[in-house]
């Protein structure tokens, strides 16, 4: 069912707004046929089709089980230059940081921000370990879910931001829109916020939550349209 005020067709807007990386939280959803993926599209072709329309996607499977090396290489091969994956890291698995870093590096230039989910209370030792486990060139988006992490932004290095925060010293921001449905007016308001960040020469990554129906790509496409105005 089309979202009110938003067309059901998703067009190629991936390169229309410089600095804006807008996409969805995943791509491997058979229920997105036929409204997003054409009838007959095979699951192994979903990513290639998705990457023709958007420049980024959240890679949530890495937060539950780290895929084998060949899969990262295949994902990189199936996406065009300029496309970026945002892998998920569950920060409670401290012993896995090194392996995770090596594995996602196989994405090469397709590696975007790493979203590190931290459910625990503020722990400076964990933060130091997490930040030190990745090359300073790697963008880190910290998904800090305990209230004790409030006002941490000022203490983060130049390659790290807090998910959802519009503040920080890093040259990028990371937004997750998780409360659908979104009206066209609400998307327009987000477009205004993001445009302000782009005007500051910041890169902005923005992801819509997956639902069974392809509302997420519709929202993403509409947001890109609004940003391009």
Task: Identify the function of each model-found stretch.
Residues 1-229:
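Residues lining hydrophobic/aromatic ligand-binding pockets adjacent to catalytic sites
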């Amino acid at each position: 069912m089309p979202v009110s005020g938003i067309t059901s067709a998703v067009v190629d807007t991936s390169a229309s707004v410089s600095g804006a990386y807008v996409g969805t939280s995943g791509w491997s959803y058979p229920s997105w046929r036929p409204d997003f993926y054409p009838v007959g599209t095979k699951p192994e072709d979903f990513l290639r089709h998705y990457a023709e329309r958007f420049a980024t996607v959240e890679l949530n499977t890495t937060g539950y089980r780290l895929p084998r090396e060949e899969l990262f290489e295949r994902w990189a091969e199936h996406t065009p230059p300029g496309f970026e994956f945002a892998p998920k890291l569950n920060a409670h698995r401290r012993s896995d940081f090194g392996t995770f870093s090596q594995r996602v590096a196989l994405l090469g230039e397709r590696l975007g921000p790493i979203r590190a989910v931290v459910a625990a209370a503020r722990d400076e030792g964990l933060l130091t370990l997490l930040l030190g486990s990745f090359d300073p060139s790697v963008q880190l988006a910290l998904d800090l879910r305990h209230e004790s992490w409030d006002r941490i932004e000022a203490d983060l290095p130049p390659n790290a931001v807090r998910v959802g925060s519009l503040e920080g010293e890093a040259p990028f921001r990371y937004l997750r829109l998780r409360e659908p449905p979104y009206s066209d007016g609400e998307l327009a308001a987000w477009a205004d916020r993001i445009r302000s960040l782009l005007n500051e020469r910041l890169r902005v990554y923005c992801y819509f939550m997956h639902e069974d129906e392809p509302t997420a790509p519709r929202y993403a496409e509409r947001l890109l349209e609004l940003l391009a105005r």
